[in-house]
Amino acid sequence: MALEDRTPGQELGRALRELTAGQEGRPMFVELYGGREAGPGGGIGALELRRAAVETAGCRERFDQREWIASGSEPSWRLEVTGRDMMLNVAGSPAPQRGAHGGLSRSPGAGVSYAASDDPGFVVVFEERRCIDPLSGSLFAYAVEVRSEGRSYSGCAAHNPAMPAP
């Protein structure tokens, strides 16, 4: 089945070249918006690139009940958000920080956010804008900022594709 790159600026093709570094046959995981072309020889028309990575579990990645998975570096950290709580794991910390939240809040032009019910300083804000992981070069549709225990962490996020978009 043929794939036609109709993304702005041929972003899909550019991501393929940059992430695979010219290594023919290197697998790349992508999430995209597009449509199936009708008729004989019809393929897929890619309209928007949502996520692209080579060093990932890709389709095997398990979101389970998680709505969001986010990560960043300096220091290395990972965030998971479910329908009820959020958990921040920072490298070097003795234990992950966990907090129940009251659901997402929308702010016009500022994305969606979650705040821990029992710790108003534990706040997560997801913004729909291109984010490129500085270590892997992977592309994401969401940028994230996490504030916790007086610190701020910035990184990239993936939304569970099996759940409604925020």
Please report, for each region that a protein language model flagged, where it lies by residue.
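Short, solvent-exposed aromatic-acidic interface loops
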Residues: A52-V54, S73, S93-P94, A157-P164
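Short, solvent-exposed beta-strand/turn "edge" segments of beta-rich domains on protein surfaces
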Residues: L19-Q23, C131-S136
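Central antiparallel beta-sheet cores of small beta-barrel/beta-sandwich binding domains
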Residues: M1-P8, R66-V125
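Small beta-barrel nucleic-acid-binding modules, principally OB-folds
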Residues: M1-M28, D118
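Short, surface-exposed linear segments at secondary-structure transitions and domain or protein termini
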Residues: G9-A15, L104-V112, D133-G137, N160-P166
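Short, compact, well-ordered microdomains
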Residues: S138-P161
